[in-house]
Structures are given as structure tokens and as C-alpha cells.
Amino acid sequence: MDLISHQPNKNPNSSTQLTPPSSSRYENQKRRDWNTFCQYLRNHRPPLSLPSCSGAHVLEFLRYLDQFGKTKVHHQNCAFFGLPNPPAPCPCPLRQAWGSLDALIGRLRAAYEENGGPPEANPFGSRAVRLFLREVRDFQAKARGVSYEKKRKRVNRQKPQTQPPLQLQQQQQQPQQGQSMMANYSGATV
């Protein structure tokens, strides 16, 4: 969709403002996340610079954000551990959901490189962060009784054809001599 008309304005009395298209929701969220992380680094004791930031600092940041979560994650000793829909309230803490953390790390990983960080030194892509996210995902799945297992791709097991598929397809499409094009149509009679 084009937000700016390319046709000249024929009315000399009207004034039109050309406004650049606004950033996407993703870009805005990425900018907010990046600013939050940079502020976290500034407020860290001792303050951290971006080049000295490691995967361990990213994990500290994720644990800090956990206190603002809105997803109930049951303790292992909670009576509702493993139940997807608990019947009553419990004192278990609210945490950041795994999906939110995963999306946050993806946005911060992109923002790090956009702000001049070298891809090979990206702390958001470190092994420690990937392992942490996997552990959070697995624990939350158990605590909530939800499975995050990957769905396996279906393998199409057909009998091997003696002719290459292209040649077979071409033969099926060409009508036999004296046969109409409608002969291959189911329900047609010749």
C-alpha cells in the first residue's frame, strides 16, 4: 500500500504534507528492547560497556526481566504442577513466558548487529543463552503440562517410479492418437 500519492496536487489552495511511512511494530519493539537493555547495562554495578557484555550478562538481564512476567509457572512441589488448567489459585510466581523471552532474544540479537556489534561476538547468540532458553522452555512445558516438542515432517512413502517424474507427467498429459483431451478427465466417456 502506497501512503504517499505520486500524482501532482491539482488544487493550488491545498497544502499536503509528505510524511514518511512509520516504522513497523517489530522495529518499534526492537528499538524499545534495545534501549531497555542499554539502560540495564548503564545501571549495572559496575556499569558495563557493550563490547564487554557477555552471555552471562544477557542471562542476568533475562533473570531481571523475569520479575515483570505475567505467566504462572508452578513449582515442582506445587499441587498443580503439570496441570494445564489449574482448578484453584496458588502462590507460585509469575514469570516471563518462554515464547516472550525467545522473541526478545531474537530482536536483541538483530539490534546488536544493527548497532555495530560484530556477529561473531553477539552475546545474544551465545551457547549459554541458547541453553538457558531451552531449559526455560522445557521447565515451563512440564510445569504447565504443555508439550513444545517439534512436529516431525511426514515422509511421503510412495513406490519408486521406473521413469523420471517429468517424463511420466509429460506422457500422461499427451493424448493418445484418436483420444480427446477430455479422456483423462474422470467421468468423461469417449
Curated annotation (Swiss-Prot):
Expressed in hypocotyls, shoot apices and lateral root primordia and, weakly, in vascular tissues. It is found in: Nucleus. Residues 25-152 form the ALOG domain. GO terms for molecular function: DNA binding. GO terms for biological process: mRNA transcription; post-embryonic plant morphogenesis; response to blue light; response to far red light; response to light stimulus; response to red light; unidimensional cell growth. The keyword Transcription applies. It comes from the Eukaryota. Residues 1-26, 180-190 have a biased composition (Polar residues). One of its GO terms (cellular component) is nucleus. Residues 1-28, 145-190 are annotated as: Disordered. Probable transcription regulator that acts as a developmental regulator by promoting cell growth in response to continuous red (cR), far-red (cFR) and blue (cB) light in a phytochrome-dependent manner, at least during seedling development. Belongs to the plant homeotic and developmental regulators ALOG protein family. This is Protein LIGHT-DEPENDENT SHORT HYPOCOTYLS 1. The lineage of its organism: Eukaryota, Viridiplantae, Streptophyta, Embryophyta, Tracheophyta.
